[in-house]
Amino acid sequence: MKTTPFTDVHIALGAKMHEFAGFNMPIEYSGIIDEHMTVVNGVGVFDVSHMGEFWVKGPNALAFIQSVTSNDASVLPLGKAQYTCFPNDKGGIVDDLLVYHYEPEKYLLVVNAGNIDKDWEWCVSHNTVGAELENSSDRTAQLAIQGPKAQEVLQRLTPVDLSSIPYYSFVTGEFAGCKNVIISNTGYTGAGGFELYFYPSDGMTIWNAIFEAGKPEGIKPIGLGARDTLRLEMGFCLYGNDLDDTTSPIEAGLGWITKFAEGKNFTNRAELERQKKEGVTRKLCAFELQEKGIPRHGYEIADAEGNVIGVVTSGTMSPVLKKGIGMGYVKPEFAKAGTDIFIKVRNKNLKAQVVKAPFRK
């Protein structure tokens, strides 16, 4: 298994470790619910060094990004980030990712850990405009410091005014005495906070400084288990569950990152444009259970008569709502908020109601 600069410290702290996307990663420390609530109410630190980072450089950098991603990067100012996806040639999604506009002719793509090799091959094979591509995944470490107290803690460690960095914006500066740290106002938790990108050799300096600075706020390390429950409470999609090679961004409710701007001829644009105009045969919806139970990935979704109308893609017991929540694909007529649906849990059909995400307001 691959390791991150923080693997040894996770083990030393007693984390429950497990393989994830080929990496030995911490799933939980003190327990998923405790860690979840730490982030919602205070501040927690996630090791997300397993994520992938690709640099796109040169005069044709923007042209390349426009040809392989669904969102419109031509309107992305310097110092801003954008959520987008790589559409595939069958109407599905290669991966969802973030694009950072780093310099006038330099962009950073941040991709999912489980898709690094697939994404890299996709980018290289679709680089018809001669952009300069660099896979720096193994040379980049990343921590996500999330929660309402994150900014307060991190401000003690940098001369950069964190309050001046709007959501989905970033700066590169000094942090904990380390140079060239990307400080990004982004996250996958809905609780606020920052993501830091830095050299692996600076990893433990930054880790130790953050935990020392955050002692008064009761800062804790957080595992991937709580990362999943936090993102699900926000209705954020997870690749491999809610998105994959067969789900289109239109079906997944990601029409807002699928821009049909003039001259933006990304992969399979015509098919996605057709879907937007004519409609789709299934839609991703969010739902809350009205009865006791926990929906899980792969459970069937039924109508009142027991007819199967879809499938659960993500589900959990919400630590904040204290009820079962989930997302799944259903026939479009069942995707509207307020619609009653039923989740097949073992031998029972548990009543649920479609809601508008996020679950945690």
From Swiss-Prot:
GO molecular-function terms, A-Z: aminomethyltransferase activity; transaminase activity
Q: What is its EC number?
A: 2.1.2.10
Alphabetized UniProt keyword annotations: Aminotransferase, Transferase
Q: Which GO terms describe its biological process?
A: glycine decarboxylation via glycine cleavage system
One GO CC annotation? cytosol
**Reaction equation(s) it catalyzes:** N(6)-[(R)-S(8)-aminomethyldihydrolipoyl]-L-lysyl-[protein] + (6S)-5,6,7,8-tetrahydrofolate = N(6)-[(R)-dihydrolipoyl]-L-lysyl-[protein] + (6R)-5,10-methylene-5,6,7,8-tetrahydrofolate + NH4(+)
Transmembrane stretches, start-end: none
InterPro entries listed in its UniProt record: GCS_T, GCS_T_bac, GCST_C, GCV_T_N, GcvT/YgfZ/DmdA, GcvT/YgfZ_C, TrmE/GcvT_dom1
Taxonomically, which superkingdom? Bacteria
Q: Which PANTHER family match?
A: AMINOMETHYLTRANSFERASE, AMINOMETHYLTRANSFERASE, MITOCHONDRIAL
Per the record, the similarity remark reads: Belongs to the GcvT family.
What does the subunit comment say? The glycine cleavage system is composed of four proteins: P, T, L and H.
Record's protein name: Aminomethyltransferase
Question: Which organism is the protein's source?
Answer: Parabacteroides distasonis (strain ATCC 8503 / DSM 20701 / CIP 104284 / JCM 5825 / NCTC 11152)
